[in-house]
């Protein structure tokens, strides 16, 4: 059975691991190694999702997507963002045509967070 709260519990665990010893915690090590290491893991996991999909292996797609989501949650923690921030953005987009939403972003009418991301460099 699906448990939608698992993402919140996982995000809380990741947040708690920020204070852990990087030698004892994979999450703490990723956060200690910095954004570029986290981004490298996200790129790697994204590629693995693509390959699993091309192979038509549904079980592998699920497992690799879980890895990708996990590393995206680590990236959010790195930027001191919360899962709720992403959910709020999805909620904001709900019911809006993808074409209209993309046009609004191109026109600069929607905050896409790029300015905020660049502040963390």
Swiss-Prot record:
Any Gene Ontology CC annotation: cytoplasm
Alphabetically ordered keywords of this record: Amino-acid biosynthesis, ATP-binding, Cytoplasm, Histidine biosynthesis, Hydrolase, Nucleotide-binding
Pfam families assigned to the protein according to its UniProt record, in alphabetical order: PRA-PH (PF01503)
Subcellular location: Cytoplasm
Keyword Signal carried by entry: no
PANTHER family for this protein: HISTIDINE BIOSYNTHESIS BIFUNCTIONAL PROTEIN, HISTIDINE BIOSYNTHESIS BIFUNCTIONAL PROTEIN HISIE
HAMAP family reported for this sequence: HisE
Protein name listed in UniProt: Phosphoribosyl-ATP pyrophosphatase
Organism this protein belongs to: Nitrosospira multiformis (strain ATCC 25196 / NCIMB 11849 / C 71)
Chain's gene name: hisE
């Amino acid at each position: 059975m699906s448990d939608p709260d698992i993402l919140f519990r996982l995000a809380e665990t990741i947040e708690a691991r920020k204070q852990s010893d990087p030698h004892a915690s994979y999450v703490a090590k990723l956060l200690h190694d910095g954004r570029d290491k986290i981004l490298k893991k996200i790129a790697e996991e994204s590629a693995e999702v693509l390959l699993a999909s091309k192979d038509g292996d549904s079980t592998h797609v699920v497992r690799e997507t879980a890895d990708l989501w996990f590393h995206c949650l680590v990236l959010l923690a790195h930027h001191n963002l919360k899962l709720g921030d992403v959910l709020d953005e999805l909620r904001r987009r709900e019911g809006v045509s993808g074409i209209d939403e993309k046009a609004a972003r191109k026109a600069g009418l929607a905050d896409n967070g790029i300015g905020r991301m660049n502040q963390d460099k």
